[in-house]
Amino acid sequence: LLNTTADYLLGLYRPVSNVSAPEERFFGSYTESLIPVIGTVKAGYGALAFEEDYGQEYARVKDPANYFYLVVRGDSMEPRIQDGDLALVHKQDTLENGDLGVLIYGDEGEGTLKRYIQRGNCVVLQPFNPAYHERVIRGEDLNHLHIAGRVVETKAKW
């Protein structure tokens, strides 16, 4: 019925193959590395705080020097990202439409974690939580918007 033997289904027989293990095939160039947790970022709109005492957290990445973690504060990205979650950020200065990013805006360096949307000649910083409003940045104000990186993963700490 299944074109196999009972021994194979019971794990008693496994044919030898030249196919690499799934982990090698898909994650071979990635390494488990300690990535620094460099501070906090508001899920709302507020300050990006850099502090030294947050420690490190493991992540499976290709180029660990180009990543950092931030502790998320606030509830504007709920229900998907909670207060206290860790956001793994890839350092880069551009984002694709729809990416989650850590963005710094304004003269005082206000930092936030939001979905990045380009609409015509403006950028929309979009929260997941419908209780919060989008922030639309246009014109001259776009000169005050800086991208710190793209959020590639979040994880909850219990």
State what each model feature region is:
Residues 1:
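Short, basic-rich loop-to-helix N-cap that marks the start of a DNA-contacting helix
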Residues 125-127:
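SH3/SH3-like beta-barrel fold
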Residues 86, 113-115, 136:
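Well-ordered beta-strand positions in beta-sheet-rich domains
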Residues 7-83, 96-97, 107-111, 118, ...:
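Short, positionally conserved secondary-structure boundary motifs
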Residues 130-141:
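Low-complexity, intrinsically disordered Gly/Pro/Thr-rich segments
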